[in-house]
Structure formats: C-alpha cells, structure tokens
C-alpha cells in the first residue's frame, strides 16, 4: 500500500503543476476496453483496484471511488483507506460532479466515451467548475516503471473457428 500512497503523492504534485483540483481516471483505456492490458492499468497503478469497472476522482484533499455492486467488497479491500467508495447503483456519477463547486477536473478524454465527457462537462459547468482535457495522459507521464506494451503479430482465424471468412466481415 506504501507504493500506492507514493503514486498518489506523485499525482497530487503533478496536479498542482497543471493547476487542477482533481484528476479523473477509470479502468478503461483509449480504446474504451473494459479489460485492459497491464501497460494500460492506470487505475490499478494509482489506487491498487484490480477490478474491471471503476472510476477514481482524486485530489490532495479528497479521494472518491465509484464502482458497481460487483466490486464494492473488492474496492474496500484493495483501495487505500483515504478513498470514499460509492456504489454506482446508488450514487449518480454525473450528479456527483455537479457538487464540485468552483473546481477544475483534469481528465484524459480519450479514455472515456464522448457522451460521458459531455455529461460530466455540463454537470461541472452548472457548479462553476470546468473539465480540462489532459492532452498527454498524466499517469502515463509519471508512471516510471510502466510495463512495456506487448506488440504481437495478428493472425487470421479459420472460417470453421469463427463462422465467416474475414473477407466477408470487411
């Protein structure tokens, strides 16, 4: 847990340099995958959460974590104690953002759906807050021992294994 607390401290310091109050990160990557490769497990690096569905909103003063009922027990076990954990079935994420008054939230918008970013941005505007697009993912910049991306050759499945030839799917 000491490593995770150190990762959080590094992020807090970077947030100050970016003049942002919060950083918003999820389990998904820039391809919006739910199950991401090790080198894109940004949420796990920051919070120690290893589930496939979660959002963290972190600042130097307050840390919030959102997940669904499948992962509540896991989140309580894996996250540092300074996180307040919410059940997404009971807490509306968009409304939560509306409660952030006069704040700025840094986010890599490539790692979220366009609709979610629009909804969060509207919600923040209602409370005189703003969303800041992180052009270069902040965690990628500070994650010094990030696993190497595995580049593998693609292969074509035989028709009997997938039902249709790949040419028919193009």
Task: List PLM regions with ranges.
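N-terminal accessory/capping or targeting/presequence segment of soluble
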Residues: 1-99, 108, 112, 116-170
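Nucleotide donor/acceptor-binding cores
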Residues: 102-104
